[in-house]
UniProtKB/Swiss-Prot annotation:
Protein localization: Nucleus
Any Pfam family the entry gives: Ovate
PROSITE patterns from the UniProt entry: OVATE (PS51754)
Disruption outcome: No visible phenotype under normal growth conditions.
GO annotation, biological process: negative regulation of DNA-templated transcription
Protein name: Transcription repressor OFP10
Amino acid sequence: MLNLQAKLNEKKVPLLTNFPTPTSSLNNLNLFSLPLVKKKMSFKKMMKYILKTIFKPIFMACGCGSTVPPSSHSHYTPGPPVSPTVLRSPCPKIDESVAMAKESINPFEDYKKSMNQMIEERYIETESELKELLRCFLDINPSPQHNLIVRAFVDVCSHLQPPHDRRGKSLGRLLRLYVNNPLDNNDDDSHQTSSK
């Protein structure tokens, strides 16, 4: 059993998505186990603390092998485990990928890391394969996350050498499409970059 856990911890799994998901419910939370800095904590502060410990950013990991379960936290009881999702795609390089929920502090960087890993592990090179990768990210995420995913995709693609598919269409046209026409603007406050 320990060897299996060690192998799972060594296995790097690309990230695929990020969206907030409750990891526990108020019914399961033991209010007496909350650390109180002062003898009396106002109800408003206590509820704010409870909400911080209940809701954690979650992202999905995707790969063709085993996935690593999210790290445990001692200050809350996790909810039921999230079952993996097998992605179906007409692109053979993405078909049969497995998406699994994971925790994320910086979703923008995690999206980029996941996309880079998928591109590297699955040898994604052509414009059509990159479009399919983006479609998979968008399909398994709620629409408020789409703008962040597209930004991460554009950032990843801007660092790739411009590949050409068999028809000679460059990726530049695809990038201009998403840069000039963002999908939505309601997640500007959730966009985190490494330059901040």
